[in-house]
Each structure stands twice: as C-alpha cells, then as structure tokens.
From Swiss-Prot:
Protein EC: 2.3.2.6
GO MF terms held by the record: leucyl-tRNA--protein transferase activity
Subcellular location: Cytoplasm
NCBIfam families xrefs: aat
Cellular component per GO, a single term: cytoplasm
Keywords: Acyltransferase, Cytoplasm, Transferase
Matching Pfam families: Leu_Phe_trans
GO BP of this protein: protein catabolic process
Keyword Lipid biosynthesis: no
Annotated source species: Teredinibacter turnerae (strain ATCC 39867 / T7901)
Record protein name field: Leucyl/phenylalanyl-tRNA--protein transferase
Amino acid sequence: MSQLQWLDADNLRFPPTHSALRDPDGLLAVGGDLSPARLIESYSHGIFPWYSDGQPLLWWTPDPRMVLRPAHVHRGRTLRKLLRQHPFTVTVDSAFDAVAQACGTIEREGQDGTWITQEMLAAYSELNRLGVAHSLEVWLQNELVGGLYGIALGTVFFGESMFSRVSGASKVGFSILCQQLENWGFELVDCQIHSGYLASFGAQEIPRATFEKLLAQHVWNIPRVPSAACYQSPIPTTSRPCPPLINWQMAWTAGEDLA
C-alpha cells in the first residue's frame, strides 16, 4: 500500500512516481516549497503542485496523463473561420500576473473556490521573471478577455490554467499558442488531467509511464525560439521583433486560415 511522503525542505528529490496514490489519483507527496528549483525539478519529472487554501502543499502525477501534440491540433471549420475573422489581439508575456490572477478568480461551473493561492501566484510570477513560466493574453479593445499560462521546459509546454470572459477568446488563444509552439519545435503540451474542452482540440490520455518517457526525450531539447532575429509568423497580419526566451512578447491579430 502506497504511503504519502513528506518532502524535506532541504532536498529537492521526489519519491518515485509509481508510488503515487490511486485514490485520489496521482497524489504523490506533501510539503516542500514552491521555490523555482523545486518547481523546475517537479515539472521535469511530470509532477505538479495542486492544493487549496488551508491545505498543505500537495504534489500530483496522475495516471493516465492528458497530452496534446502541437503539430496535431484539431481545428474544425468553425474554429478556422473564427481564426480568420476574430476581433481579438493576442500577445505573449505582456500581462503574466493579470492572467494568473484572472485564472484564479474567475467563476467556474462545479468548482467552489480556487487552487491558485497567493503563494502559487507569487511562485509562478517568479518563474515568469526567470523565463520559465509564460502567459498568453487575449485582448478585446484593450481589455483582457482571455488567457492562459504555463511552464516551458525544453520542447514541452506544461499548461496550468486558462480563462475566458467572452465567447471564442480561449479557443483563439489556445489555437494560436499551439501553432506558435509547433513553429518553435515544441513536441508536447501537458494538459494534466482529462478535459472535454481540450479533447476537442485533439488532446488524448496516455499512460503515465509513456508520458515520462516523452519528458525524458524532450524536456532537455532546445526549442527554436528566435533570440535576436525578427520572427514572422504565418498566422498574424502584424508582428514585432521577438526578444530572447526570457520574454516571448509578440502580438497577433486575425490572420490566415490554419489547415
């Protein structure tokens, strides 16, 4: 019978993932901290923090794991039309804290409260400052109406949370992000647990062991993110020079069809 392990504050190592509980699925360890070093260590092995106010820090590695290949994103006819005609401007890393705050405060059906605590917000904001965590923002007439954030390690993007305040905002944002990740050579988007919404984009569940093998292959790869050169995306009608990886700042408006 598996038993939860309390993490040592001075030791970044996690217990083997096969020791995670089956009920609740994937609960692996308790305690530790949200330091950048521990978070990078955890994500590189497919482990992520998920807990609510009043709970101890909980670490998870569910089995199966839901993942999406950026190159295999499904875009139906309605979404392709929306991508050609949407009224939004999409940016990256221009309002990370605002996106994370919105993800933590927006009301969601079937959920009471949020798992995005102030401690979590501070930790991921620091990762963004370090160039490890990134956000995508969807704007409508200078108002933030949608977005998402996550962690980028090698050629894997670990999605954390998303929000939408108007119809179509999250679909446009997520689709554009996946296209950009594909252009940059990313192999995998970690969606953590099953979501019907993400399944509509082509996300699928795979065994945890398979997921971990994919991480071992791709977490240490170097993505094709431009550093000094001007990047021209096939999606937008406007773009601007892309700074180094520590700042993915770019902007899109409605553009060409995505096949």
